[in-house]
A protein has these predicted regions:
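Small-residue-enriched core segments of transmembrane alpha-helices in multipass membrane transport
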Residues: 163-178, 279-288
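Hydrophobic alpha-helical transmembrane segments of ABC transporter permease domains
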Residues: 23, 34, 121-166, 251-255, ...
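Short intracellular "coupling" helices and adjacent cytoplasmic loop segments at the cytosolic face
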Residues: 86, 94-118, 122-124, 198-222, ...
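An intracellular "coupling" helix at the cytosolic face of ABC transporter transmembrane type-1 domains
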Residues: 15, 105-106, 122-131, 135, ...
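A short amphipathic helical element positioned immediately N-terminal to and/or at the very start
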Residues: 1-15, 116
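Cytosolic ends of transmembrane helices, especially the final helix of ABC transmembrane type-1 domains
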Residues: 215, 239, 286-314
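ABC-type nucleotide-binding domain
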Residues: 331-581
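Transmembrane helix-loop-helix hairpins at lipid-water interfaces of multipass membrane proteins
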Residues: 18-73, 154-159, 271-274
């Protein structure tokens, strides 16, 4: 299927605007015929001694009329064709962004940020140029060439016209071969640009780590290698691009030589006039643009085709986590029950035989060593992944029976790697609901024990925190992320190791606030520091994806297992730190 067929949905969507633009292009092509025709008549009148002042003024009027008409119509087709093409860019970017929001974490492990950015910028820009400059070139070149050739054929000399177009088949063959090479080269240059984008994004994000290890020289060398590869790929593409215009001009020059040779002989024989020859050469000059446009069109079409293939491949990726065909309505918080027989991530068994339940309003603590499966339990509840064997039930229904947006609307999630936007503290906290009053924001920050930190800043809640909260400490980032979740007062609050960068005293105050404000709400806390879950109604100890201990804090201490030993060890460490202070 050709790229034009693939974009036909857009041309149908904007058919009225494109139709107006094409009509304007046709009229410009017709008006373009007037100046050479007028010139030929004036030259013949001068050589025949028949030119009067009235005829001269009338011909000048025709020229001015044609010039003003073309000026206005060129403005129209630019607005209606080139202007409309930007609409395609807008639609495709929206499609891509919507697609990104629906994809599972596995998708983002396959595609890197820089690669996705390249699709949303360079590839879509190539499509925009095709829908604008490409359509304009195709229509304008076709109409101009057709109208001009017909005029040359029937109003001047069909013999000269046939001679003039003799080089065209050879040009078409050469252009086709060059187009195929351009297609391949542009695909490689776009892939190289994606890699460069990835490298820049990764290098800038990790600049602190690079400096701390004194790795600047090696990182610069690595970047220069990627940069050089991108340069070479772009240079190869430009090499083929640069061949188009000289090649077209070579064939156009051949047409001029043949026309002058045959035309001069015909003038000598009296078959045509000097004015006819001048008009014919002027028309031939007008054919230069259509011939050049063929090269431009081949170039821009190949680029658009490559970019559309890349975008199409991206949009064809489907998330393994989907909404049910017949979703349940009216989701409500209630009894949460895990009944997981097994779950594998990337073909590796992650969770096995996970069975427990949590009543509405209770708190669940998940503890265990790193990699024990705590976060996997959270991801399954959020439906970032789906259970292989078994199910998770909420209020008696499999969570897969609810729409994703409905399920997640019940939850406030604070992940291990919290993400903050490069805006103000106020905007970050109100991210879930920008219309919340300042009083609600202040209350949420007090619950998360970050209020005083904020008011001590010169700009207070209007402080711009930089990309990913770069101006804040680790503990401040965690507490801001908690404020963002807590301000929504979710039915299910999930804190995934969200207190790791907070000191023990602040942690105790936050936990105390949670106990007070979330008596009728479900709370799930994963932690390495066991003091964060001592108040939980149910604590699960995970090891290698299995539950090895369960119960309340007192129950687990009585078991004298992993939990009790770890808790006692951590308490001794905390006491030692306090004594040292």
């Amino acid at each position: 299927m050709s790229i034009i067929q693939k974009l036909w949905w857009f041309f149908k969507l904007e058919k009225r605007r494109y139709l107006v633009g094409i009509v304007a292009l046709v009229l410009v092509s017709v008006l373009n015929l007037i100046p050479p025709m007028v010139m030929g008549r004036v030259i013949d009148a001068i050589t025949g001694g028949q030119l009067t002042q009235q005829d001269l003024l009338l011909n000048l009027f025709y020229l001015l009329l044609a010039a003003f008409g073309m000026y206005y119509l060129r403005y129209v087709w630019r607005m209606y064709i080139l202007g409309t093409s930007y609409r395609l860019g807008q639609i495709m970017r929206s499609r891509l962004f919507e697609h990104f929001t629906k994809m599972s974490p596995a998708f983002y492990q396959t595609y890197r940020t820089g690669d996705l950015m390249a699709h949303a910028t360079n590839d879509i820009n190539a499509l925009t140029r095709l829908a604008g400059g490409g359509v304009m070139s195709a229509v304008d070149a076709s109409i101009t060439a057709l109208v001009t050739l017909l005029t040359m054929l029937f109003s001047i000399s069909w013999q000269m016209t046939l001679v003039a177009i003799l080089p065209l088949p050879f040009m078409a063959y050469a252009t086709s071969r060059l187009g195929r090479k351009t297609h391949k080269a542009f695909g490689e240059s776009q892939a190289a640009f994606s890699e460069l984008n990835n490298k820049v994004q990764e290098s800038v994000s990790g600049i602190k780590v690079t400096k701390s290890f004194g790795y600047q020289a090696d990182e610069l060398k690595s970047f220069q290698a990627v940069n050089e590869l991108t340069f070479q790929k772009n240079l190869q593409t430009m090499k083929y691009d640069s061949l188009f215009d000289p090649m077209v001009l070579l064939f156009v020059g051949s047409s001029y030589v043949l026309t002058l040779l045959i035309g001069s002989l015909m003038v000598q024989k009296g078959q045509i006039t000097v004015g006819n020859l001048v008009t014919f050469i002027s028309y031939l000059d007008m054919l230069v643009w259509p011939l050049m446009a063929i090269g431009f069109l081949f170039n821009i079409t190949q680029r658009g085709k490559v970019s559309y293939q890349r975008i199409e491949n991206l949009l064809s990726q489907e998330s393994p986590v989907k909404d049910p065909e017949f979703p349940l309505d009216g989701i409500e918080n209630g009894r949460l029950e895990y009944a997981i027989d097994s779950f594998a991530f990337e073909n590796e068994e992650t969770l096995t035989d996970i069975h427990f339940s949590l009543e509405k309003g209770q708190t669940l603590g998940l503890v265990g060593q790193t990699g024990s499966g705590k976060t996997s339990l959270i991801k399954l509840l959020l439906r970032e992944y789906d259970v292989d064997k078994g199910a998770i039930y909420l209020n008696g229904h499999d969570i897969r029976d609810y729409r994703l947006i409905d399920l997640r609307s019940l939850m406030g999630y604070v992940p291990q790697d919290q993400f903050l936007f490069a805006t103000s503290i106020l905007d970050n906290i109100r991210f879930g609901n920008p219309n919340l009053p300042l009083s609600a924001v202040e209350e949420a920050t007090k619950l998360a024990q970050v209020y005083q930190d904020i008011v001590d800043m010169p700009q207070g809640f209007d402080t711009v925190i930089g990309e990913k909260g770069v101006s804040l400490s680790g503990g401040q980032k965690q507490r801001l992320a908690m404020s963002r979740a807590m301000i929504l007062d979710p039915d299910i609050l999930i804190l995934d190791d969200s207190l790791s960068a907070v000191d023990a005293k602040t942690e105790y105050a936050i936990i105390d606030n949670l106990k007070e404000t979330r008596k009728d709400k479900t709370t799930i806390i994963t932690a390495h520091r066991l003091s964060a879950v001592v108040h939980a109604d149910l604590i699960l100890v995970l090891q290698n994806g299995q539950i090895i201990e369960r119960g309340t804090h007192d129950d687990l201490l009585a078991l004298d297992g992993w939990y009790a030993q770890t808790y006692q060890s951590q308490q001794l460490e905390m006491k030692g730190e306090e004594d040292a202070e």
